[in-house]
């Protein structure tokens, strides 16, 4: 299982609106095109947005290819009032919002 963590800023009180955008999008074809198995959205502290994507493979290349897809553009446009780049000076595209995992541990099956 691959985990991708997207980090951004979110407007105060926007969690229900953001969740609605994704609930509607997740009922369409976009999660299947990207390869999303599970999505979790988190808010941390004063306006930090965390978006965890769980998938079989790294979704970054597919997300990069789908930025022009009508459903991807629609989600992005609907999120604009609520979500913004964590660091606007360095953001050029979706990959720039993806955190780099530097440690992972998994329990081995007992046996």
From Swiss-Prot:
It holds the Pfam family Cyclase_polyket. SUPFAM superfamilies: Dimeric alpha+beta barrel (SSF54909). One of its GO terms (biological process) is polyketide biosynthetic process. This is Uncharacterized protein SCO5314. It comes from Streptomyces coelicolor (strain ATCC BAA-471 / A3(2) / M145).
């Amino acid at each position: 299982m691959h985990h991708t963590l997207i980090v951004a800023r979110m407007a105060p009180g926007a969690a229900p609106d953001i969740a609605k955008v994704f609930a509607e999008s997740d009922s369409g074809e976009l999660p299947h095109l990207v390869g999303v198995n599970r999505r979790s959205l988190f808010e941390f502290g004063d306006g930090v947005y965390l978006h965890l994507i769980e998938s079989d493979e790294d979704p970054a290349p597919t997300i990069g290819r789908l930025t022009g897809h009508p459903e991807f553009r629609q989600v992005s446009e609907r999120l604009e009032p609520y979500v913004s780049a964590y660091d606007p000076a360095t953001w050029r595209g979706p990959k720039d919002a993806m955190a780099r995992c530097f440690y992972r541990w998994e329990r081995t099956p007992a046996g």
